[in-house]
């Protein structure tokens, strides 16, 4: 699982390489030299240009984008069939966000694994995902193809979509949802 902010997900007193190696050893024990090579390769696979240097750094010594790439490397080194990414780009600026999404997309496609992408950013979801499940009060209230998200029917989904800002459109107060108890049923 790739979490929202690497600053809170990575151990601050352990070098990044050691954290990734620990994950590898927990799932597929191997000799230390082999683990170092695999950690190096995992960091390179997520677009880190100098993996050997980054392996020695502590989380506070890297940028948010590099920390998130390290988190992705840590999650992928165990060879999962499914990756859960919970708001993996929300703590990143837009440029880095797109880079991280590109890395995730490539790795998921190359490895043939599934991805559950959790996000409140409906624009991002509609451009990055195949299918969308909209949840309200812990329950799925709508399932729709991402390309059809703009045609969603559930009042909660419509309310979320109506809150998205439109470039060039006049500003207006955000609509208030008239929440119904049956939405959560």
Segments predicted by a language model, with ranges:
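A short, proline-enriched helix->beta-strand linker immediately N-terminal to the Walker B motif
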Residues: 77-81
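Helical segment within the ABC ATPase nucleotide-binding domain
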Residues: 98-111, 123
